[in-house]
Curated annotation (Swiss-Prot):
Species, as recorded: Xenopus laevis
Keyword Phosphoprotein: yes
GO BP: any one term: DNA damage response
PANTHER family found in the cross-reference section: CYCLINS (PTHR10177)
The family this protein is said to belong to: Belongs to the cyclin family. Cyclin D subfamily.
Gene: ccnd1
Compartment list: Nucleus; Cytoplasm
Keyword set, alphabetical order: Cell cycle, Cell division, Cyclin, Cytoplasm, Nucleus, Phosphoprotein, Transcription, Transcription regulation, Ubl conjugation
Pfam family, one: Cyclin_C
Transmembrane helix is among the record's keywords: no
PROSITE patterns per UniProt: CYCLINS (PS00292)
Annotated protein name in UniProt: G1/S-specific cyclin-D1
């Protein structure tokens, strides 16, 4: 008798439960997000050593870890929510900021992943600057300060509600979903979006995705003005505030792309310099080549 291994790397996923994208659930989420928003003023009122640029650095590192580990899209924004909420109530030494970031990813992966990140793996990503026992101690500290309230509402929770209300094909929805998720992750790295409620970030991300994909003209339901008005009615906010959030997201995307292009050009220049050195060291005579 032959034994066949049928194990696969892909994780099985349940179909979307339509009961979870009803208006009743949406209204409950809009009420719940008010209690899970961190304070924007914690840099001035709570933290003595932590600066906005430090948050940017650790957030970028956390995003890279989540991408390399192929975490669920919700893990990174949820981890940043934990980080900001903790920093809103507890002063922290700057030397412990990476430990806090690793701990928040540890907790978020437990909430959203089928196979969560391990403490040992996260310590490796810090070049072993922290130990697993330190991470576990910090985990209890974070849980205590967050009062064990880990079911935070994030922008990802709203995206499916918005797409469900839009007359689109499934393929188009999937493209918008991926673009909006990218915008949400980008917003989580920027300190200027801390004060924005998750519903507004999600609506602004969806609107920016539709605009970037050129899905509508001036007369269609997906025109900038009509879509902004529609989404603002769904989340019960001022259309001008939502439009400002969308423009802020688009501006952040442009600056991020510009920065990435500059880094790419700098790395290309460095590579060209190395190549020139290699060329100058190449023997001009075949007899000089050491096989």
């Amino acid at each position: 008798m032959e034994l066949l291994c049928c194990e696969v790397d892909t994780i099985g996923r349940a179909h979307l439960d339509r009961n979870l994208i009803t208006d009743r659930v949406l209204q409950t989420m809009l009420k719940a997000e008010e209690t899970s928003c961190p304070s924007m003023s914690y840099f001035k009122c709570v933290q003595k050593e932590i600066l906005p640029n430090m948050r940017k650095i650790v957030a970028t590192w956390m995003l890279e870890v989540c991408e390399e580990q192929k975490c669920e899209e919700e893990v990174f924004p949820l981890a940043m929510n934990y980080l900001d909420r903790f920093l809103s109530v507890e002063p922290l030494r700057k030397s412990w900021l990476q430990l806090l970031g690793a701990t928040c990813m540890f907790l978020a992966s437990k909430m959203k992943e089928t196979i969560p990140l391990t403490a040992e793996k996260l310590c490796i990503y810090t070049d072993n600057s922290i130990r697993p026992d330190e991470l576990l101690i910090m985990e209890l500290r974070v849980l205590n300060k967050l009062k064990w309230d880990l079911a935070s509402v994030t922008p990802h929770d709203f995206i499916e509600h918005f797409l469900n209300k839009m007359p689109l094909t499934e393929d188009t929805k999937q493209i918008i979903r991926k673009h909006a998720q990218t915008f949400v992750a980008l917003c989580a790295t920027d300190v200027n979006f801390i004060s924005n409620p998750p519903s507004m970030i999600a609506a602004g991300s969806v609107a920016a995705a539709v605009q970037g994909l050129n899905l509508g003209n001036a007369d269609s339901v997906f025109s900038t003005q009509r879509l902004t008005l529609f989404l603002s009615q769904v989340i019960k906010c001022d259309p001008d505030c939502l439009r400002a959030c969308q423009e802020q997201i688009e501006s952040l995307l442009e600056s991020s792309l510009r920065q990435a292009q500059q880094q790419h050009n700098a790395s290309s220049d460095t590579k060209n310099m190395v190549d020139e050195v290699d060329i100058s060291c190449t023997p001009t005579d075949v007899r000089d080549v050491n096989i």
